[in-house]
């Protein structure tokens, strides 16, 4: 009965109080380091936490902005708890707080940077009579983040990124919750991805992308089991392509101009090098859907046929190949890119089908091998590398 009476007497009576000068000065000085003005408010009261204790709340608002952080806490001689929350807050590059931070930490490698989205934060920790070590959890929620920028004259854009990183632990042991990342669209270095999503597992020492998928060239691109060591980002991975549009895919091959129809499948091997600062294409293999007929109409086949002169083809033979590629119905289309020594590579194109010359149909069984530097054969633009390095190659 005595304990109950004490509990009733010590039930929280929250009263606004002045923030202690030491705490207020610390909050204001930390905000001032970022060029911001903070307005702290506090309330205190009493509570019963396996014994008499103190409870209260602290709220810090950034002046002339929607940014707000609030904390609730309670403690006694036996146990304590604390919770921090930042309500969902919309932001953009024109937000006063964001603008101040960008002025302090400018992004020099890009221009025309615009972005928007919303973010929320929650965290809590406690130590009770039954759990003598602190138990904690934290969650950051990012919604509908979109950004666009220019890097070395090339546009990059990301729209609709949503992800919720979360972690929990006991004392200093950390368990990071698996994340599911979604992005509505990505445009970078001439490549467009739609409906990107990825499952990611993060530990204190590594990142594992268990699966990722996106719409690409009217089809699908998939990635499986990409392991990243943050201290050494040199790694390789394979992209699997399924049911992509042949016409869209061939626009990324230098020398291709014209129209194509049909669906392609295959895989592309890529490497992260120089600590993740550059992406290098290794090998690639694409093939048409077996049993289906596609169309190939090259408006300028000369870039693909000029290399035949080095293989001993005379002008008439090269002209016949060029004529065939201007109006071709193919049953087999294969592209095989093989990286050689240094920057050299070979692009092998195999086409089987029927070419139309006026009213005459001619069977075609052709393999073209084009040698050159890899970046000349495939129009990757190395834009991702240039963005990270901040320079043009």
Which residue stretches match the model-derived regions?
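Hydrophobic membrane-insertion alpha-helices, especially the h-region
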Residues: 2-16
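Terminal hydrophobic membrane-targeting helix
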Residues: 12-83
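Outer-membrane beta-barrel transmembrane domain signature of Gram-negative proteins
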Residues: 214-216
